[in-house]
Amino acid sequence: MAVKMARRMAELRASEIREILKLTQRPEVISFAGGLPAAETFPAEDIAGVTTKVLSEDGPRALQYSPTEGFPPLRQAIADRMNAKLGTAVDSSEILITSGSQQGLDFTGKILLDPGDVVLCESPTYLGAINAFKAYEPQFVEIETDDDGMVVSDLERRLSGIPNARFIYVIPDFQNPSGNTWSLERRKGVMDLARRFEVPVIEDSPYAEVRFEGQSVPPLKSLEGNEWVVFLGTFSKVFCPGLRLGWLSAAPELFQKYVFVKQAADLHTSTLGQMQLAGYLETYGLDRNIQGVIDLYRSRRDVMLRTMEAEFPDGITWTRPEGGMFLWITLPESLNAREILELCLVEDVAFVPGGAFFPNGGHENTLRMNYSTSSTERIEEGVKRMAKVLRQAIE
């Protein structure tokens, strides 16, 4: 079938993570590949009760079309929570409900990018964002990062030489894939540059409340110059991803563009889903659920780190995240993580090769590990299997 496709389709590929997940469907495979929340944290019974209440008391509205911006009580609840927990000063009129924060990424590309424009991003960065933006045919310029976040001097150098930089995409808290969190100094430095060069910052914040230890750091959206920040949030990592509920917050002029794009894309996010979540937040709040997520993921992270320390051969380094769902491993440069993955799959264990997280390629000796999904017993066994493969590869 010879259908003539749009030029942008040449840049789109299946998500590498999704392709790997297909290989891990066998129950015996211990997968550190996906970014899946632990299903045992989903409050299914409570949601069932809330759903019954919503449908019995307000069924016609829950099953009807609703405003593009979102269900007003949910927008208010999100604004209140952002202001109380994150130190922002947003109004509910600045909250747009999206079908997961992934939709916010797609809308950002649609609004801000013409072919050939430049996206500035961390190196490495979230694979889902790379794929979302690629549809709009940009160039990616990767900014150097270290344990404290984006290197401000490198960002300044790039901004000074790139006239068509359209936005800076960042994940400052428990970054996917590295697990690192930006220091306050780095956050302020990036905001200073955003104001000076008048370039928007897209702050993707799925994990900020999943902190195991250490002090929380204010989001960019709470700092001076926050009118330049588009904040993307989601309930997928702290509630449940199947409802596909996220949000964004932006300054009024840009916010209205997101509303127009949302209208064209899907009119609005599921009314029933929004009312389910609003009812849950009103009845139970979110703190209890988040604490359960934190306690579970902390224990799983600890087992992964402890087993890696005991079993991995010399010459391998990794990050030690204070929260979130991922850590990042750097192998000796002589090793290729894709080749190691093939060997690990024979041992029924999987991860994501790190090269997928660099939009311009390279860095094939890196990989991402997820600790949120598997039990502590399976994490320990899976890391031991990986260690066996790595020892053989290094020898």
Language-model regions, residue ranges each:
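Conserved core segment of the aminotransferase class I/II
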Residues: 225-295
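Conserved core of the PLP fold type I
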Residues: 61-198, 202, 208-226, 297, ...
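Conserved PLP cofactor-binding pocket of PLP-dependent enzymes
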Residues: 29, 206, 210, 345-368
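Conserved glycine-rich beta-strand-loop-beta hairpin in the small C-terminal domain of fold type I
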Residues: 278, 291, 295-305, 317-330, ...
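N-terminal small-domain helix-loop-helix segment of the aminotransferase-like
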Residues: 8-100, 107, 282-283, 350, ...
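PLP-dependent enzyme catalytic core of the Aspartate aminotransferase-like
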Residues: 1, 346, 359-395
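Short, conserved charged micro-motifs
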Residues: 335-340, 377-381
